[in-house]
């Protein structure tokens, strides 16, 4: 803040000094002398209200954009409910189309083993999507306890003015600190943190699988429906011409029923929606998978990137203290302790708690010795 004020007041201060050097007090008219006095008085008043020796350009920018930050935070907070309803409505529409439009078609064409496979896989995928989305919305991400002095803290939150454990960050939308905060997700209307990070990623992963399954499985139906829609457009065009030219005894051209029209349009809608979501959400899922493999969150990636550059300039190597190795990172993230847990905790709905309490980050006992040595560096 002080740097910006000096930049703005520099030319005015230079003019005042020139006037002093030229002896303005004897030669300048009283009007100019009064303006100079008012300028000095205004500068003293401004400094008495705004001057802060601890401030800087970053403080000035934050203060200037504070109304914008407040508007964005409050808009996202209210739009989160709209986004959650939108996800539920769109997902429900795909399920309804699958039962009302796709199922009657495949019952007439698919064999019994193929029908059984699609039946079990689609319902397994749907159950996992619904379970993880519900858990991601309703599970609190985890907050540091207030009033306790026995927790290991790294710094003090500038917003909450409370001790902040490692990997904890302040969410301006929720207006509180979150343990192992990854980001605030408007599609969940919730922060993604220590206790619901697994639910968020699992929802993204299984939703991507479901969209890819629907897009690939309905490709033939989509092509037939798209061709039928084009044929409907041509028939409607020919019908208008025939009505204009037909005689009283001529039969009007055949047309599609309302149910056939809605079925074809629904199949096209299903394919386009699932394909677009598969691409967008698939890219997001891959990105978070890379971060999990590195033992980072979205926020920590930017922090570690700056720290890596700072240490590289000093000729030193940065090591992420929370990186146990790719496989062990996934075990910690998914809460997998034994081989059986890959089935019961990953491929089936499970509400088990993650490792640790989100405030201290000691390596689990089954982490390899190499990972433990990395933690000690």
Swiss-Prot record:
The active site is at residue 185. It comes from the Eukaryota. One of its GO terms (molecular function) is palmitoyltransferase activity. Residues 99-116, 220-266 are lumenal. PROSITE patterns: DHHC (PS50216). Residues 1-77, 138-198, 288-377 are cytoplasmic. Belongs to the DHHC palmitoyltransferase family. The keyword Endoplasmic reticulum applies. GO terms for cellular component: endoplasmic reticulum membrane; Golgi apparatus. It catalyses: L-cysteinyl-[protein] + hexadecanoyl-CoA = S-hexadecanoyl-L-cysteinyl-[protein] + CoA. Its main location: endoplasmic reticulum. This is Palmitoyltransferase ZDHHC16. The chain crosses the membrane at residues 78-98, 117-137, 199-219, 267-287. It is found in: Endoplasmic reticulum membrane. It is a multi-pass membrane protein. Keywords: Acyltransferase, Apoptosis, DNA damage, Endoplasmic reticulum, Membrane, Transferase, Transmembrane, Transmembrane helix. Interacts with ABL1. Interacts with COPS5/JAB1. Coiled coil: none annotated. GO terms for biological process: apoptotic process; DNA damage response; eye development; fibroblast growth factor receptor signaling pathway involved in forebrain neuron fate commitment; heart development; protein palmitoylation; telencephalon development. The lineage of its organism: Eukaryota, Metazoa, Chordata, Craniata, Vertebrata. The DHHC domain is required for palmitoyltransferase activity.
